[in-house]
Amino acid sequence: MVDLSKDLQFFKVFLPEFGSHELVIPPAFIDMLEKPLPKEAFLVDEIGRLWCVETKTEDTEERFCVFFTKGWQSFANDQSLEFGDFLVFSYDGDSRFSVTIFANDGCKKDVGVVSTTDRSRVSLDEEEPDDIFTKPDRMRDCDCGQSINRKRKRDSVNEDPHVLVDDKPEYVSTYKTKPEHSEKTQRTVNRAGDTCDISWFPEKKHNGFEESVYKPKHPHFVRNITRGSLQKLELPLTFLRSNGIELEEDIELCDESGKKWPLKILNHDRGFKFSHESWLCFCKSHEMILTNKCLFEFIVPSNGRCSEILVRIVSGRLPTTMTKNNYQVIDMQP
């Protein structure tokens, strides 16, 4: 299991007068780092949405500071940050910051549906690099450096970040709003009719993605595996509502081999999540690591009540896109 105690974390209280356009990273946090921050970093909220931000170093006789600059204002606007909001940043040691936001009443803010203000908000098929996750760290338990020198801290922004960018057009796809996509894929996917038969069919290699791409025939979304999602896997309410899905309290996860894992659907402050212990055991059994992605495909009968979810674990990159309802799906473009 990922050792959460090793997280590099800091917090900030949002003050619009000082933090609307850029955000100062605490110098004490910079002192903890074993390597410089990249020139471009990624902020990810609790349901897996990403924003690209630039970092800037100010090194003068008066002070030494590192900022989030370009892209931060979009993140603040999209998250509707208000005076006194409490933000916790968890850094993966590479280029990714997971952000948890608490309102001034002490409770987590409802992430809700955001409306992006510019292209600094990214979907995985557009600007996510291969190496924005931590090095693979195997799960071992189902229940769940030294400081750099001053010179290195002064060079804390790497001038040559290795960021891969795929220039792909924006594409919005959901199962119900784009039925023609499912018609194209039903001829090639799951031919045996077995709901547990999740197959991949070869396609031409494109834009660095895996050569074989699975085309789901059922409503689905894609989730990055992060430290947060290993502990708590939330189901996007926008996904469930846009596809007219009602979840049974007791469901089964069906993996690629056809093995089924029973678990419960629980209510939480923003909707629904998988029961903690059962989800952790599923993760451990499949040796999930932080570079994985999970494709969740919902088997929905005519009554709209779902009790089975197909799960495919992917280690490489996927051609995904962000829907207008702000969850990731497989890009169905030919």
Curated annotation (Swiss-Prot):
One of its GO terms (cellular component) is nucleus. Residues 8-105, 218-317 bind DNA. This is Putative B3 domain-containing protein At5g66980. It is found in: Nucleus. InterPro entries: B3_DNA-bd, DNA-bd_pseudobarrel_sf, Plant_B3_domain. SUPFAM superfamilies: DNA-binding pseudobarrel domain. Keywords: DNA-binding, Nucleus, Repeat, Transcription, Transcription regulation. GO terms for molecular function: DNA binding. It comes from the Eukaryota. Signal peptide: none annotated. GO terms for biological process: regulation of DNA-templated transcription. Its main location: nucleus.
